């Protein structure tokens, strides 16, 4: 099988650094190749790894002395390690396998067969990439693997190759090419494309698989790129510019395939909003912008515009950066007798008659039909107007500013979303059966197409969708929003047609068949349930697995009201709070079939959280039930809003009917902010749980309660509501700071002498890491299921950082200390200033923090007067009547009123 000049068919070079958790699996995937391990040389290059990788390497090298070479070198980075490994390579073909990835068993056999068949045509073969661990699915560049074939990059330049690990390279092709050790990001794409540039072709082997591990600890290079300073100017210089310079020496023009590849990397940099999203200083950021402009100058306009996986708004902004003052000569708008057009270099790219309006909200009020949405287009939005037409009546749309939807690139607002609102009096519906929407510019007016988002109740992705409101049923037909009277006959016909369409689509798609079968069953059960249940249903939920927050406190209050409303609390059945709440109220297991049916039948969903899992227990099956999500969402909040969360909590993303606030400045910041709610949607009522806060009595206690940090925890499992353990958490400053605090002997000794207990209770999103902390005998670690209320009521002093629990604690005028050793947190504050508005000292130093705690212990845990005054000025109510205010406000929603 082997040629005379080579001892192996393949040499696999594996650069190793800090991968002991994954290394064995990677090595075994090579050993188990169907081609036979005797035909493979495995070169393990230890780049001075500090973990136990060396032990694993030596064990395998000893077990397979004829196949495995182990080499150790001084740390120099992945390119250095790969180049070092090439010195030992004795195979015909080279693969650079990352030690946390895998290859499918038949990969080498399939690749060898392909090389044997096409050995003189190509120097490199690529295989498709599939994600593993932290992400599922396949790489978005896999679309070129329609078949096993040779790809000619001059004929298909848009099919780019950016990953060297999923390629196999002829050793002879690497004689004069090495990885650029000065290039820290993009070094593999650089090498691969320099090789491709020789023959302008490469092979594709569809049958093989490269399993790319996206680590759950967030440490894959792809995941951490933007946090790395090298991702900015360094990569533009050593990767993009240098690659262009090398090719310029050999070719008159940069080949299209290389332009596409460079633009593929550059497009992610266009998503940077401004300097605040970078680790750069002002001079470095200025250079960053200059480098982007310089690289774009080598990329054809068509290549820029045809770049995939990024909005056209960013791509046209790239054209604007490239052409500067001359941009208007390349991209411009013109009106003709037929239409209004957008041109790029003389070619029509958009026209007024081809525009689409998106309807996001469709509501039926007492006297009108209320419609809200937006228009997204490459046209400059200035001068465009919208109106609805019903019969012969035209109703102008009101413009709505939607700053949270603005597209921002590199410090410039590149696209504003024109939002609109239309109220159609019900009197116009009597003699008509459809509504049309028009867009105008100058003298031109054109009928628009329609697209629907979730709060409309309709969908463009399913046939025969409809939504039944109080008096009317709405559906659509291409460019018309249709309606008819809501009666049993019309509802039955629309539902029958929708279910029939669903059933047909399920028969055509095996992938969707199971989901559609469940949807059909759930919809039928829902319709039967509504026949027998005429009472309104309210659902209350805190977290999936924990109660004891605002929703439970309000639930406990509301169930004692004789108002004809059925009230249920939603929580996981294995939660410790499930049986406790069941003793006094009705409890439904989270995501149980009954929970799902009740969601479809509910009039109110009331929660301390606004995440998708609160309002949608169906998760990705939501599309089949969109028309039945008719409940009003009441957001009680978990903590007081200090930052601008309008990008997340805005009306079009969450559609909150009543958002409860507790503080005067908080209320003002939301009413006047970019949330797009009306004043009556925001209630200044106080948190329900505040009604049960008490002054501490009996034992004295110091409560240490820091919040979480998104950069030190792993992504949350939305279904389970938990985060997996992060082995790198102990490397964080957060860990070292709080571990030192809860083991500080000076603090502990003084607490002992003065009879103060010390309790440590970090945020629930840190609880999976609690095992990492060193536990002092005197310090109690509060259980995850501990009652917040009991902890607040039994404590005298609190240490926190940025957490909103400080508000609960200070509400009873107990002393709070803010331990803020960082310069910034993971959100930007809106109106709130800790030093000017906080209820205690803001400290950065460990010793100063301990001094302040001791001061309070010496002074009977009394909050200073200046902070007591701040409490009085901040909170709207301290009368223990918050639950009543909120309960009455929810009742009055049905009358479109909010209790003042």
From Swiss-Prot:
<dbReference type="InterPro" id="IPR007554">
    <property type="entry name" value="Glycerophosphate_synth"/>
</dbReference>
<dbReference type="Pfam" id="PF04464">
    <property type="entry name" value="Glyphos_transf"/>
</dbReference>
<comment type="similarity">
    <text>Belongs to the glycosyltransferase 2 family.</text>
</comment>
<dbReference type="GO" id="GO:0016758">
    <property type="term" value="F:hexosyltransferase activity"/>
</dbReference>
<keyword id="KW-0961">Cell wall biogenesis/degradation</keyword>
<keyword id="KW-0777">Teichoic acid biosynthesis</keyword>
<comment type="function">
    <text>Involved in the biosynthesis of galactosamine-containing minor teichoic acid, a non-essential cell wall polymer in B.subtilis 168.</text>
</comment>
<dbReference type="InterPro" id="IPR043148">
    <property type="entry name" value="TagF_C"/>
</dbReference>
<dbReference type="GO" id="GO:0016020">
    <property type="term" value="C:membrane"/>
</dbReference>
<dbReference type="GO" id="GO:0016757">
    <property type="term" value="F:glycosyltransferase activity"/>
</dbReference>
<protein>
    <recommendedName>
        <fullName>Minor teichoic acid biosynthesis protein GgaB</fullName>
    </recommendedName>
</protein>
<keyword id="KW-0808">Transferase</keyword>
<dbReference type="GO" id="GO:0019350">
    <property type="term" value="P:teichoic acid biosynthetic process"/>
</dbReference>
<dbReference type="Pfam" id="PF00535">
    <property type="entry name" value="Glycos_transf_2"/>
</dbReference>
<dbReference type="GO" id="GO:0071555">
    <property type="term" value="P:cell wall organization"/>
</dbReference>
<comment type="pathway">
    <text>Cell wall biogenesis; poly(glucopyranosyl N-acetylgalactosamine 1-phosphate) teichoic acid biosynthesis.</text>
</comment>
<dbReference type="InterPro" id="IPR029044">
    <property type="entry name" value="Nucleotide-diphossugar_trans"/>
</dbReference>
<dbReference type="InterPro" id="IPR001173">
    <property type="entry name" value="Glyco_trans_2-like"/>
</dbReference>
<dbReference type="GO" id="GO:0047355">
    <property type="term" value="F:CDP-glycerol glycerophosphotransferase activity"/>
</dbReference>
<keyword id="KW-0328">Glycosyltransferase</keyword>
């Amino acid at each position: 099988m082997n040629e005379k000049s080579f001892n192996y068919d393949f040499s696999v070079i594996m650069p190793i650094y800090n991968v002991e958790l994954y290394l064995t699996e990677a090595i075994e995937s090579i050993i188990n190749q169907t081609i036979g391990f005797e035909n493979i040389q495995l070169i393990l290059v230890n780049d001075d790894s500090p973990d136990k990788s060396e032990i694993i390497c030596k064990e395998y090298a000893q077990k397979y002395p004829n196949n495995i070479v182990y080499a150790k070198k001084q740390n120099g980075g992945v390119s250095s390690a790969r180049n070092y490994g090439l010195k030992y390579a004795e195979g015909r073909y080279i693969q650079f396998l990352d030690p946390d990835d895998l290859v499918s068993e038949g990969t080498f056999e399939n690749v060898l067969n392909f090389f044997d068949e096409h050995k003189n045509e190509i120097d490199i073969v690529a295989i498709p990439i599939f994600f593993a661990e932290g992400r599922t699915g396949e790489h978005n560049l896999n679309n070129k693997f329609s078949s096993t074939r040779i790809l000619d990059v001059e004929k298909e330049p848009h099919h780019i190759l950016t990953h060297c690990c999923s390629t196999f390279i002829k050793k002879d092709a690497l004689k004069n090419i090495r990885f650029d050790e000065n290039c820290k990001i993009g070094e593999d794409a650089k090498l691969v494309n320099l090789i491709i540039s020789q023959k302008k072709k490469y092979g594709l082997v569809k049958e093989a698989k490269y399993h790319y591990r996206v680590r759950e600890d967030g440490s894959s290079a792809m995941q951490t790129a933007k946090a790395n300073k090298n991702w900015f100017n360094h990569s533009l210089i050593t990767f993009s510019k240098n690659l262009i310079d090398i090719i310029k020496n050999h070719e008159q023009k940069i080949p299209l395939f290389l332009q596409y590849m460079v633009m593929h990397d550059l497009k992610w940099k266009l998503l940077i909003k401004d300097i605040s999203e970078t680790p750069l200083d002002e001079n470095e950021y200025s250079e960053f912008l200059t480098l982007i402009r310089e690289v774009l100058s080598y990329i054809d306009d068509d290549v820029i515009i045809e770049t995939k996986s990024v909005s056209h708004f960013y791509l046209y902004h790239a054209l604007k950066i490239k052409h500067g003052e001359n941009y208007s000569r390349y991209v411009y708008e013109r009106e003709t007798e037929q239409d209004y057009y957008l041109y790029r270099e003389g070619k029509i790219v958009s026209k007024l008659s081809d525009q689409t309006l998106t309807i996001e909200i469709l509501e039926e009020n007492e006297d009108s039909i209320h419609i809200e949405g937006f228009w997204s287009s490459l046209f400059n939005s200035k001068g465009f107007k919208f109106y609805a037409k019903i019969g012969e009546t035209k109703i102008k749309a009101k413009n709505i500013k939607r700053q949270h939807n603005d597209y921002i690139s590199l410090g410039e607002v590149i696209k504003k979303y024109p939002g609109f609102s239309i109220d159609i009096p019900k009197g116009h519906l009597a003699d008509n059966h459809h509504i049309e929407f028009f867009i105008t510019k100058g003298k031109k007016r054109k009928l628009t197409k329609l697209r629907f988002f979730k709060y409309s109740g309709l969908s463009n992705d399913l046939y025969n969708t409809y939504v039944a409101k109080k008096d009317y049923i709405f559906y659509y037909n291409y460019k018309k929003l249709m309606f008819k009277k809501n009666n049993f006959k019309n509802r039955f016909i629309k539902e029958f047609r929708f279910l029939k369409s669903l059933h047909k689509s399920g028969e055509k798609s095996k992938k969707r068949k199971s989901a559609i079968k469940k949807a059909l069953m759930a919809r039928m059960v829902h319709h039967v349930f509504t026949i027998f249940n005429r009472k309104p249903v309210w659902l209350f939920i805190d977290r999936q697995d924990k109660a004891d927050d605002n929703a439970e406190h309000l639930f406990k209050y509301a169930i004692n009201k004789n108002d004809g409303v059925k009230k249920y609390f939603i929580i996981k059945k294995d939660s410790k709070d499930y049986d406790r709440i069941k003793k006094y109220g009705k409890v439904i297991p989270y995501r149980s079939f009954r929970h799902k049916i009740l969601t479809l039948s509910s009039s109110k969903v009331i929660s301390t959280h606004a995440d998708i899992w609160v309002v949608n227990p169906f998760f990705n099956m939501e599309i089949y039930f969109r028309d039945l999500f008719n409940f009003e969402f009441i957001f009680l909040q978990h903590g007081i809003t200090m930052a601008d969360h309008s990008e997340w909590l805005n009306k079009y993303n969450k559609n909150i009917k009543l958002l409860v606030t507790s503080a005067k400045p908080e209320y003002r910041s939301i009413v006047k902010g970019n949330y797009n709610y009306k004043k009556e949607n925001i209630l200044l009522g106080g948190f329900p749980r505040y009604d049960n806060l008490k002054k501490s009595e009996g034992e004295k206690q110091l409560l240490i309660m820091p919040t979480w940090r998104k950069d030190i925890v792993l992504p949350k499992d939305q279904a389970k509501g938990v985060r997996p353990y992060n082995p790198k958490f102990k490397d964080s400053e957060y860990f070292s700071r709080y571990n030192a605090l809860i083991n500080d002997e000076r603090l502990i000794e003084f607490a002992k002498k003065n009879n103060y207990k010390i309790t440590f209770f970090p945020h629930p999103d840190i609880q999976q890491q609690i095992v990492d902390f060193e536990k002092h005998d005197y310090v109690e670690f509060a259980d995850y299921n501990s009652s917040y209320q009991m902890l607040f009521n039994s404590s005298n002093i609190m240490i926190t950082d940025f957490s909103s629990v400080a508000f609960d604690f200070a509400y009873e005028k107990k002393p709070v200390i803010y331990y803020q050793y960082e310069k910034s947190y993971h959100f930007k504050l809106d109106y709130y200033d800790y030093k000017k508005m906080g209820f205690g000292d803001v400290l950065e130093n460990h010793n100063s923090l301990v001094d302040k705690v001791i001061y309070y212990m010496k002074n009977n845990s009394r909050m200073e007067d200046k902070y007591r005054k701040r409490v009085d000025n901040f909170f709207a109510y301290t009368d223990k009547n918050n639950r009543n205010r909120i309960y009455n406000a929810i009742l009055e929603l049905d009358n479109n009123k909010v209790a003042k």
